Amino acid sequence: MNDTKQQPLLIVEDSDEDFAALTRIITKISTSNPIYRCEDGEEALDFLYREGLYADKTAPRPSLIVLDLNLPGTDGREVLTALKKDRDLQTIPVVILSTSSNPKDINACYRQGVSGYIIKPMDTQRLNKLVENFLSYWFEAVELPSSTIIS
């Protein structure tokens, strides 16, 4: 069994408030998961492809990606498309956390192979509960792919 307490988590989120809420919940559930943040799609692709500021080949491969769809510049839809087309990255589970409740977005994301789609509620307590349940599932119930690079 993988030690999910050590698995890196990539959060692609432009909202400081939403990122702060996510990290607060994550540290409540698991204090030792490394958390990486990218604020837009271009930064996320650089992180995943180890380009630009992330050109260090020892940069960790995330075992789980939490992706917002509505990002500045390259949006989450484009990040998801690139990720799922890449043989080395397509096995990383991606969970969408977005304000979009549009059935077209939800269906398109599932067609591209997301592992889950969570609509961000406006209520903070509801958001906390949803994220806590989702993270408990990912960190406690399932086996995540190894964070080591498979080439």
Feature names for model-found ranges:
Residues 56-60, 84-91, 112:
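Conserved phosphotransfer cores of two-component systems
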Residues 120:
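A Lys-centered signature of the CheY-like receiver
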Residues 1-10, 15-36, 42-45, 49, ...:
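Non-catalytic signal-transmission and effector/linker regions of two-component phosphorelay proteins
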Residues 67-68, 98:
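Active-site residues of response regulator receiver
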Residues 115:
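Short, glycine/charged-rich "phosphate-handling" switch motifs in NTP-dependent
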Residues 72, 102:
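The feature encodes the CheY-like receiver
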